[in-house]
Amino acid sequence: MERIKELRDLMSQSRTREILTKTTVDHMAIIKKYTSGRQEKNPALRMKWMMAMKYPITADKRIMEMIPERNEQGQTLWSKTNDAGSDRVMVSPLAVTWWNRNGPTTSTVHYPKVYKTYFEKVERLKHGTFGPVHFRNQVKIRRRVDINPGHADLSAKEAQDVIMEVVFPNEVGARILTSESQLTITKEKKEELQDCKIAPLMVAYMLERELVRKTRFLPVAGGTSSVYIEVLHLTQGTCWEQMYTPGGEVRNDDVDQSLIIAARNIVRRAMVSADPLASLLEMCHSTQIGGIRMVDILRQNPTEEQAVDICKAAMGLRISSSFSFGGFTFKRTSGSSVKREEEVLTGNLQTLKIRVHEGYEEFTMVGRRATAILRKATRRLIQLIVGGRDEQSIAEAIIVAMVFSQEDCMIKAVRGDLNFVNRANQRLNPMHQLLRHFQKDAKVLFQNWGIETIDNVMGMIGILPDMTPSTEMSLRGIRVSKMGVDEYSSTERVVVSIDRFLRVRDLRGNVLLSPEEVSETQGTEKLTITYSSSMMWEINGPESVLVNTYQWIIRNWEAVKIQWSQDPTMLYNKMEFEPFQSLVPKAARGQYSGFVRTLFQQMRDVIGTFDTVQIIKLLPFAAAPPEQSRMQFSSLTVNVRGSGMRILVRGNSPVFNYSKATKRLTVLGKDAGALTEDPDEGTAGVESAVLRGFLILGKEDKRYGPALSINELSNLAKGEKANVLIGQGDVVLVMKRKRDSSILTDSQTATKRIRMAIN
């Protein structure tokens, strides 16, 4: 206070003011400070005094020919005196105004293309809606966020190659454009920027904004997608927030969101298959998101989410070293532990085998709606400081931390038996058993935990067993903070391994992720996700399974038909028929299968009874393990649309309807494709009937001797080949089948093969 008073007195004397404003600065140290190096030491001041000068700008001499000396108002636009120390002209700010109004114009067609990200941002803000401002304490936590809406996901190196190719195509240097996205973008941009007069360096800068994801570690409360981050300064302050709805979406946010949904669906589906890891990989490789292969997106997209990270681990990509438990991301910030198996007894006297972490450790816990700092020792929670959006979110974090601590009072709080299972009906591991139990009801856990009196610490309050705040008492070791806990900022990635049950471990063997950690939240994807794998047919319900199964048979009919006649068992075991089984009533599966297989065998044995449409219709039913029974069926039931619907063994039904006129199949009213051949049996040629039991291999082959007549064929041994004369004097090579069971009665196939062999 004294100093301020003294300064005020000094300033009130006119002499002080005069000294401060008029005296020249001639102290060498000061001059050195402000003149050494090219970096401006005080940009704001420099700008102020430059603009106070008459000619603060320097320009090339050519400007004197392009701009008049005076404007319409008679004000001087440039000075005849040269700029000291350079061969340039001193120019007034008024010259800029003159140039903007009267200078040469150029084509503006390329501006929206080059400055695309800016134009799009203006549109988003124009159509965005700003709501009311609310004043409240903001719990912000630093998260790594995408600050650059509307970008592709190229790596810096990939983007550099694209930029060089587009902007400086004639520069020397090897550029390898390999990925599909690189090639597409390069082609598109070259066309867009033909005859572009904007400075190449500027174009390069702007392209970089479009191609590369830029992330920053920023304090955020609320939305983290890039269209919210670009208005962060407008939507949240220290003690206020403004509601905002973006006026448009950008593809990069949509990709992130759709990727998470696809990954969750795939992990959930893989869990219940016989070989989860193989299934997961098959699905990742056959899925597209917004028309781009999912595996390409996984390689480039830095999104960290449990399901996405499991997919990345399966592909052999590095992922973050933090681990996941109860939907929270744990990152150890100090301490260490060794793991030891220990048997513990629950309050219900059930024995659990848990892996105990021995040693002192500190963790940060980050969830979507709550964050915490946890300090623990062996089977003991020392301190938990938690911050969150609401009571519910804080409670979730407390439960997870209590279970993670492995304290005895938590295990003793279990009432009833623990027998939670995952989607594949396998028992969960003990830690997840405990977690599920208390997530359902944590009353006993909170009651038994114990409470303590607390000191008054700024920004911290206590929380009671019923989750109400208190300034006097709190659950033992637990405090609620007004501040959030920052997410782990490092982008370091580590090598991990994954086992067949999709458990991801680091090189030390610590489990970082398991399918139990994948959220059950369902969302609607912003971009179209195309799952080509039959394992994902059921994602859109029973109808989709039905339509997809029949579409698959029709698409692959040529191959299916040959297998049907030669190797039916292999055909019945195809994974494409797996989803269909869930539609067939459990009790009837085996009987239907036995019935259909017998029917098919009769078709193979009795000439002329082959019926394409009927085979297609009944084939999926033959995939279940068959029961030997003499039962006959005139219709088979499938469970769709919430009830049993019938497929008629002979003839059409609403479920399966083949139109002879259009040769198209409709399943539940949806088009399932066309049969390219004529399934009408009247066209069956006599040759195909006579050649029953022989496989047509192709054109005549002289090595197998002269052509036999059809009657002479009966003398061939199984597996023997011969040329045979058929029809109008054509010769084809045939082989007598090795197995009677797989005799080809498919008249179309035989006729078709004869045709192919002749032509």
Swiss-Prot record:
Pfam family, one: Flu_PB2_3rd
HAMAP family, alphabetized: INV_PB2
Functional description taken from the UniProt entry: Plays an essential role in transcription initiation and cap-stealing mechanism, in which cellular capped pre-mRNAs are used to generate primers for viral transcription. Recognizes and binds the 7-methylguanosine-containing cap of the target pre-RNA which is subsequently cleaved after 10-13 nucleotides by the viral protein PA. Plays a role in the initiation of the viral genome replication and modulates the activity of the ribonucleoprotein (RNP) complex.
Family: Belongs to the influenza viruses PB2 family.
Record protein name field: Polymerase basic protein 2
Ranges that cross the membrane: none
Entry keyword set: Cap snatching, Eukaryotic host gene expression shutoff by virus, Eukaryotic host transcription shutoff by virus, Host gene expression shutoff by virus, Host nucleus, Host-virus interaction, Inhibition of host RNA polymerase II by virus, mRNA capping, mRNA processing, Viral transcription, Virion
Site note Avian adaptation, residues: 627
Gene Ontology MF term list: RNA binding; RNA-directed RNA polymerase activity
GO cellular component labels: host cell nucleus; virion component
Subcellular location: Virion; Host nucleus
Gene: PB2
Record text on subunit structure and interactions: Influenza RNA polymerase is composed of three subunits: PB1, PB2 and PA. Interacts (via N-terminus) with PB1 (via C-terminus). Interacts with nucleoprotein NP (via N-terminus).
GO biological process: 7-methylguanosine mRNA capping; cap snatching; DNA-templated transcription; symbiont-mediated suppression of host gene expression; symbiont-mediated suppression of host mRNA transcription via inhibition of RNA polymerase II activity; viral RNA genome replication
SUPFAM superfamilies reported in the protein's UniProt record: PB2 C-terminal domain-like
Domain of life: Viruses
